[in-house]
Regions:
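Flexible inter-repeat linkers and adjacent short helices
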Residues: 1-95, 104, 118, 272, ...
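Alpha-solenoid helical repeat architecture
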Residues: 3-8, 44-49, 83-90, 123-130, ...
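Tandem amphipathic alpha-helical repeat scaffolds
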Residues: 12-23, 53-64, 89-103, 130-143, ...
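Eukaryotic all-alpha helical interaction scaffolds
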Residues: 19, 39-40, 79-80, 99, ...
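Helix-turn-helix repeat elements of alpha-solenoid scaffolds
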Residues: 20-36, 61-76, 103-114, 144-154, ...
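Intrinsically disordered, low-complexity linker/loop segments enriched in Gly/Pro
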Residues: 106-109, 113-128, 133-165
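Solenoidal tandem-repeat scaffolds enriched in leucines and small polar residues
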Residues: 139-218
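Alpha-helical scaffold segments of alpha-solenoid architecture
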Residues: 178, 191, 195-304
Length: 392
């Protein structure tokens, strides 16, 4: 058997890295298959294997962002004994991204800060833009909008100056839009979404368009425009690939919530049946609890039973460490019971939402707490942008 040099494999790894950071799914998958064969025939080289392991993590995250592929538990990596600047940077970046994915936000922030120092030794503008995008996404999730906008504007400026990174520019536009939405500037938020949708149309990328329609539906929900929100969600759910991804659950939860908010119960029941059929094949405990909550809140007649079952569903989210989701549903229940005139139950859910907000604050250190945006109830679901998660 012919032994392949580590340099040859390393060169192909660089090709893979470029495909991954461009979010070129087809090419990245092709190179991934090729690399698995090359590694079987490569001479022993720990540095190349470490580089491959770290890029594989980025590859899986890309598939999660672009196609909604589920992430498995990450391989635990020891600190590489022999590294160069790029591998050392990837090491901390990879760990930061997984810490964020697992909702360990305090650790993620610390690891991102270490990675940022390592990044100073890497003269690569696109790598800088990618890093700023990921950090901006984290601060966006933590509602630190001004910090997030600082990072994402840097990324936008870089991506605009390089051809071939239109998808990454669209992802950056989404993060900017979300931050402007969080500070109540709906017009600027909509403008950024319009720019991102224009890119998806130019690329003829229907999956990306579905992700964008989901995210813009959140903007319309925040602005109290339920019909526009529902229209955007139905457009998101019109793509077959999107329907088979994990993002389906995000959009369906949002769609059901908006339909019920305008008392379209018959249409909501139709979608509940679709969700039930899909959950028989692929069950997600977080979204099962969320769907059950919506059904109990709007279809259970007895007030006491309604309140108890909703508290039970929220407790499941707490056990699964979905604090943001639990807070959102507590706020939604408080509003619903207030409208029914059940002030005591409304108070209990309002109190729960307030306590969950302080649980959220505990993710941050003291300095970050002082910068956190003022608490307000926000009936949002999770976004489909993981840059995670964010269009991706």
């Amino acid at each position: 058997m012919t032994i392949i040099s580590a340099e040859q494999v390393g060169n192909r790894l660089n090709d893979w890295r470029i495909a991954i950071r461009k979010h070129d799914v087809h090419n990245a998958k092709t190179i991934y298959t090729e690399l698995k064969e090359l590694l079987q025939e490569m001479e022993e080289n720990q540095e190349v294997l470490t580089y491959y392991s770290l890029l594989e993590g980025k590859f899986k995250l890309m598939l999660y962002e672009r196609r909604g592929k589920k992430l498995n538990e990450p391989t635990v990596l020891e600190y590489p004994s022999k590294t160069n600047d790029l591998i050392e940077y990837y090491f901390y970046l990879y760990k930061a991204l997984y810490a964020s994915y697992n909702r360990d936000y305090a650790s993620a922030i610390g690891l991102f800060k270490i990675a940022e120092k390592k990044l100073q030794n890497i003269p690569d503008e696109i790598e800088v833009a990618e890093f700023h995008t990921k950090v901006a996404n984290l601060y966006m999730m933590l509602r630190q909008s001004l910090i997030s906008l600082h990072y994402i504007q840097n990324a936008i400026d870089i991506f605009k100056g390089h051809d071939g990174y239109e998808r990454r520019l669209a992802a950056a536009f989404v993060i900017a839009a979300t931050n402007f939405m969080d500070i109540g500037d709906f017009k600027r938020a909509e403008n950024y979404y319009t720019k991102a949708l224009h890119i998806s149309n130019q690329l003829n990328d229907h999956f990306l368009a579905s992700q964008l329609y989901h995210n813009i539906s959140i903007l319309y929900a925040e602005a109290g425009e339920s019909k526009k929100c529902i229209d955007a969600l139905e457009k998101a759910l019109s793509d077959d690939d999107y329907l088979s991804s994990c993002y389906f659950e995000h959009s369906m939860f949002m769609l059901l919530k908006e339909l019920l908010s305008i008392d379209e119960k018959s249409q909501a029941l139709y979608y509940f049946e679709l969700v039930k059929q899909k959950q028989e094949i692929d069950r997600n405990p977080i979204y099962t609890a969320k769907m059950n909550f919506l059904y109990h809140l709007f279809f259970t007649e007895d007030i006491s039973k309604k309140a108890q079952t909703c508290f039970d569903d929220i407790s499941i989210l707490k056990e699964l460490k979905d604090v943001e989701g639990a807070r959102e549903l507590s706020a939604l229940a408080a509003k619903h019971f207030e409208e029914l005139g059940s002030i005591h139950q409304a108070y209990l859910f309002l109190k729960d939402a307030y306590q969950l907000e302080h649980t959220t604050l505990n993710w941050r250190n003291y300095d970050e707490k002082s910068e956190f945006t003022h608490f307000r109830f926000s009936h949002r679901c999770f976004r489909t942008n993981g840059v995670l998660q964010f269009v991706k």
